[in-house]
A protein has these predicted regions:
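A short, Lys/Arg-rich alpha-helix, primarily the initiator
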Residues: 1-23, 70
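Short, charged recognition helix plus adjacent turn
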Residues: 69-99
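The alpha-helix within a helix-turn-helix
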Residues: 18, 29, 58
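Short alpha-helical DNA-recognition segment
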Residues: 22-41
């Protein structure tokens, strides 16, 4: 069974928001008051969406900040699981005990 690629929030920002609305990275940066380098890094998938950026995107697009942070959290968790699967598989569940 083929696994799906882990999608960075920057790809969702680009494909689901910027392209359909014909908004450039420069315009987004200017409109929400962040450096264009930050926007470009997010769109390239090399920078995470922070709480600050999530709030700005939510106000601009009429979404919630939790939407953007949730996308980032999902991406981060999948990356850690993928990169540390062997190490994480060694962790055993703590058995319940009476105190």
């Amino acid at each position: 069974m083929e696994t799906l690629a882990n999608i960075h929030p920057g790809e969702i920002l680009s494909e689901e928001f910027l392209k359909p609305m014909n908004i450039s990275a420069y315009k987004l940066s200017k409109d929400i008051g962040i450096p264009q380098t930050r926007t470009s890094a997010i769109l390239k998938g090399v920078r995470a969406i922070t709480a600050d950026t999530a709030l700005r995107l939510s106000l601009y697009f009429g979404t919630s900040a939790k939407f953007w942070l949730g996308l980032q959290d999902d991406f981060d968790l999948e990356e850690v699981f993928k990169n540390k699967q062997v190490e994480l598989s060694k962790i055993k569940k703590k058995e319940d005990y009476a105190a």
